[in-house]
Amino acid sequence: MDKLLIRGGKPLNGPIRVSGSKNAALPILLAAPLLTEKTVVDNVPRLRDIHTTLKLNEILGCPSTFEGNTVTMEPAANLNPEAPYDLVRTMRASVLVLGPLLARTGRARVALPGGCAIGARPVNLHLTALEKMGATFTLEAGYIEGRCDRLTGAHIVFDFPTVGGTENLLMAASLAEGTTILENAAREPEVADLADFLNAMGAKITGHGTSVITIEGVPSLGGGRYSVMPDRIEAATYMIAAAITGGELHLECCPFMELDAVVSKLREMGVVIEATNAGVAVRRQGQLVGVDVATQVYPGFPTDVQAQIMALMCVAVGSSSIRETIFENRFMHVQELVRLGAQIRISSQTAFIRGVGTLTGAPVMASDLRASASLVLAGLAAKGETLIQRVYHLDRGYEAMEVKLQNVGADIERLT
């Protein structure tokens, strides 16, 4: 099992290119069963979850090739409507095949999903919405089995602005009969990117990026070429890397406009962030100071950056707090940061952080994707050596992270 060894205390300086968004690429690739023509998707990050998705698509009957950062998907000759447990158990996003399979075949049998163990992310919001379009579901032997005649348009109001639920319904409704209206829909840029992709393939979707989305069903979707948006979570992580090490990074292909909430909090802490012709320049100016953060759905502060900014708070002057409002049980990185010398106290869904002068390297263990990024950031700032175990979590969401960090001056190596 791979590990990362970091010798910290070195400022990072230089350019880093932000990769394509994992959270945008996954639903775009999982839309493969909807397509009837060859489709080329560019700027796809080479990640473990992407490879799992392409394996799943192949089992469903949608073959593809992955060269560089380009995926070429061929249309399915015969769709297999079953997503097996062996693949689905490793990746929660795989539940997104429900909508496309029901829309194309009238049947879907999908194992209950796995992925990061950061609390319940119930799929009932997906199922309830699809039922309003005419699908019926049973749960048997760990599988969700759905059936329908042709899906029909419906007016759906989500109880919560679910990202996965909105994406599933965008895909299902694209081939439904009639018009579907989604209220309280997720506004995340990755949801809008999926809608833009579907429109490029022939769908008729409007309102994406707002809380009310309208989808007019079409008989079929074709193919084409599309480029995935840059990864705003990766960009935020490297912004924090510049700040926590006291260096200056220049982020290329940075989705600056989608990072308002993160940029605002980092500036409040004393981080200088400037848009340039080449991207975004990030550096620390003087002492970092503590702030209070509450995670929110977009356009609020993203839960996927909660663990990373906590690492930064650990070395800031004064007190900080983070209230996690999206997921329960997403503070599993706290005990590992404490091993590095951080002072953190948890009360219910809020973490209270008192900044310390320096962190000290120690062996730590990653518990999930963003927790692993938090430990890398802390290790970059810590004195001495930090050994991070279970970095397979990191490989699910960050493309060649140690290589990118090495190129800007980090002393980091992968041990196999």
From Swiss-Prot:
Modified-residue entries (2-(S-cysteinyl)pyruvic acid O-phosphothioketal), positions: C116
GO biological process, one term: regulation of cell shape
Location(s) in or outside the cell: Cytoplasm
UniProt cross-references to InterPro entries, sorted A to Z: Enolpyruvate_Tfrase_dom, Enolpyruvate_Tfrase_sf, MurA_subfamily, RNA3'P_cycl/enolpyr_Trfase_a/b, UDP_GlcNAc_COvinyl_MurA
Residues annotated to bind phosphoenolpyruvate: K22, N23
Domain of life where this protein originates: Bacteria
Pathways per UniProt: Cell wall biogenesis; peptidoglycan biosynthesis
Active site: C116
UniProt xrefs under Gene3D superfamilies: Enolpyruvate transferase domain
Residues given in the record as UDP-N-acetyl-alpha-D-glucosamine binding sites: R92, D304, I326
Keyword Signal: no
Catalytic activity: phosphoenolpyruvate + UDP-N-acetyl-alpha-D-glucosamine = UDP-N-acetyl-3-O-(1-carboxyvinyl)-alpha-D-glucosamine + phosphate
Keywords: Cell cycle, Cell division, Cell shape, Cell wall biogenesis/degradation, Cytoplasm, Peptidoglycan synthesis, Pyruvate, Transferase
Predominant location: cytoplasm
GO terms under cellular component: cytoplasm
GO molecular function terms listed in the Swiss-Prot or TrEMBL record: UDP-N-acetylglucosamine 1-carboxyvinyltransferase activity
EC number: 2.5.1.7
Keyword set includes Transferase: yes
Function, in words: Cell wall formation. Adds enolpyruvyl to UDP-N-acetylglucosamine.
Family: Belongs to the EPSP synthase family. MurA subfamily.
Designated name of the protein: UDP-N-acetylglucosamine 1-carboxyvinyltransferase
